[in-house]
């Protein structure tokens, strides 16, 4: 009888955990679309889910990404450290997740602050390992791409990236025919980032062609997505026509909003 009650209790807890995890993830998707005020609620729900079932890997992945987003967007070191811990726990439970390994490696390079060489090398090795294990994984390549932009050229080989622009082009080719209501601007953003990479390499002619390709991607149909696309197009067009600021200097391009932007009016002041 006691065993039966325990089984029923654990089953109910697991069900509640998944419900809270989904509630948190739904809120987090709204955050990525631009409604940043929902971020505390998203994290709260996912933390509640973790307290009920700390081994539910899908929730850990989304919670870690939410902390990563908070740390990168609002420059919160505590959130970066929280993200690292959650990704580390997730990898203990499922070592096969190279997407989590790439995120964890990137976080270690950030946390090293350019001073802790041992931590940086550990992060670089994790990024390189994730890439070697799953070279076709888009998430791994995207994390590698954004990490490489924050590293000096001589350090990029340490994470397995000798050709940052080539890596971005690979992702761009994957996303050219990609359609998603969740990430409606993926192709636009990747072509713009390729353009920025070419600008950094000094190839202004090819950079302009990549920016033009981004602007030619068909417009979305949803009103919110149209509003988001308008913001992205304006930034890209300004850069293409001689603007001095890299696209990454703009908040919507500096973190995770760009591919998902559908509520630009709800972005919090910077």
Regions found by a protein language model. Give the residues of each.
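N-terminal leader/linker segments that initiate helical-solenoid repeat arrays
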Residues: 10-51, 57-65
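Sequence context surrounding c-type heme c attachment/ligation sites in exported
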Residues: 14, 18-21, 25, 179-200, ...
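"A position-specific structural signal for the A-helix of alpha-solenoid helical repeats
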Residues: 22, 62, 69, 103, ...
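Short coil/turn linking the two alpha-helices of tandem helical-hairpin repeats
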Residues: 24, 28-36, 64, 69-75, ...
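Flexible helix-coil transition and linker loops at the boundaries of alpha-helical arrays
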Residues: 47-60, 88-100, 128-140, 171-184, ...
């Amino acid at each position: 009888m006691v065993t039966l009650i325990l089984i029923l209790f654990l089953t109910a807890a697991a069900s509640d955990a998944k419900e809270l995890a989904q509630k948190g993830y739904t809120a987090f998707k709204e955050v990525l679309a631009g409604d940043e005020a929902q971020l505390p609620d998203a994290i709260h729900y996912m933390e509640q889910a973790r307290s009920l079932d700390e081994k539910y890997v899908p929730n850990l992945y989304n919670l870690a990404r939410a902390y990563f987003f908070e740390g990168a967007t609002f420059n919160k070191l505590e959130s970066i450290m929280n993200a690292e811990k959650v990704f580390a726990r997730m990898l203990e439970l499922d070592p096969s997740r190279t997407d989590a390994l790439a995120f964890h490696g990137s976080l270690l390079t950030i946390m090293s602050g350019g001073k802790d060489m041992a931590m940086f090398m550990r992060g670089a090795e994790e990024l390189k390992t994730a890439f070697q294990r799953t070279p076709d994984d888009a998430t791994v390549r995207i994390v590698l791409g954004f990490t490489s932009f924050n590293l000096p050229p001589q350090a990029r080989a340490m994470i397995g990236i000798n050709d940052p622009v080539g890596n971005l082009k690979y992702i761009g080719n994957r996303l050219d025919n990609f359609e998603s209501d969740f990430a409606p601007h993926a192709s636009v953003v990747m072509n713009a980032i390729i353009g920025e990479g070419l600008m950094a390499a000094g190839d202004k002619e090819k950079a302009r062609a990549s920016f033009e390709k981004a602007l030619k991607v068909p417009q979305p149909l949803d009103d919110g997505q149209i509003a988001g696309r308008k913001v992205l197009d304006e930034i890209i067009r300004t850069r293409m026509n001689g603007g001095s600021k890299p696209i990454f200097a703009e908040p919507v391009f500096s973190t995770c909003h760009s591919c998902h932007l559908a509520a630009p009016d709800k972005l919090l002041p910077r």
